[in-house]
Amino acid sequence: MNDPIFVKNKIKPFNKIISVTGDKSLSIRWALLASQAKGKSRAYNILRSSDVINTLNCLKRLGIKVKLKKKYCEIEGFGLNKFNNKKQITLNAGNSGTLGRLILGLLVCHDKKIRVVGDKSLSKRDFSRVIIPLKKFGAKFKYKKNYKLPIEIIGTRNH
């Protein structure tokens, strides 16, 4: 097995307003990044598709505070790699390959066993391009043959 990779530099805090379109991919990525910030992040005009709602639900299951209001979404995170779930949980990515792949990356430094599932279509997709590199960070995985969902990840606190 290869040596683990360690990320040393963290993103410095900033207080900026960033304007983007209500796009599914951007909305998912914003929510996941906001979950890693310390404090509140607010986005206006996020897309309210099933993939984005599944993302917000996954973050809630991980103990992140999420408020979805009529005009905005607010996420209150605890900082980098700081999820607040106390037990093993299952996260449902629905049909979102973006969510399924990116959430695995966030869970690498989480020390709880997390099961990621998806719908019938997503469960046919190959996750090897994510799992193989993430193993270098020290995470352990259990999955069906050919790197398919459901996937269990046990991360590592080595970060």
Language-model features: locations:
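Structural preference for solvent-exposed beta-strand-turn elements
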Residues: 1-159
